[in-house]
Amino acid sequence: MRQDAGLASIHNNELNTGRQISALLKKDLLLETRQQHTFYGILLYIASTIFVIYLTLEDPDASTWNAIFWITQLFICINAVAKSFLQEAKGRMLYYYTITSPVSFILSKLAYNAVLMIAMSIINLLVYTAMLGNPTSNYISFCMIGILGGCGLGLIFTMLAAIASKALQQASLMAILGFPLILPQLMMLVRLSKTAFGEIFNNGIPLQMIALLLAFDLLMIILSVILFPFLWKD
């Protein structure tokens, strides 16, 4: 009987966590639709950044095209994801503290920002291709890598934004914490993207890099779930 009660309790907790995540995701979507100036601001940032690159380079070679795409992707992620915690007022966070668990809260933020960055990656890629051309030999492959990279960057900066939101110098702290985490991932994404330009790798190398990127994303989720409850109590 005790075992059955324990299993029922676990099942109920899982249901509650799922409902909390769903409700928090709906809340973030509702805020995004009500505060459309933020979304349009990011779109303007994408268009203006790529337009400046177009005016400067016009017809970049494949290596430059690839490198600048990921640099653009990085700064888009900083602008899009950093606000997820910075816009939350202290009173609102106190309210969340009373109605949801820290795990549900951080998982909802991770999921929302991952989806947001997938959308931003697609938009960035379309605008980038329209203005700077398409030197890739396998555009679909590059799109998939871009989506994978955007999702991973979103997960990293969600965790960093959660940590930085508890500090005074939030932007500086995000830059300091983010550099050692972002650099290896960006280097791997740039290298993996070269497969879409026709560069030949040894058998299994691209799959190994994809597996490493997915493992890194999973590590970010696990670390967020472990560390965020301590920030939640602060």
Task: Identify the residue ranges that each predicted region occupies.
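Aromatic- and glycine-rich beta-strand/loop motifs that create alpha-glucan
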Residues: 10-41
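Transmembrane alpha-helical segments of integral membrane proteins
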Residues: 152-159, 185-199
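A structural motif at transmembrane helix-loop-helix junctions in multipass membrane proteins
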Residues: 147-179, 232-234
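Membrane-interfacial helix-loop-helix connectors in multipass membrane proteins
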Residues: 56-60, 126-145, 193-210
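Junction motif at the cytosolic side of a transmembrane helix
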Residues: 130, 217-234
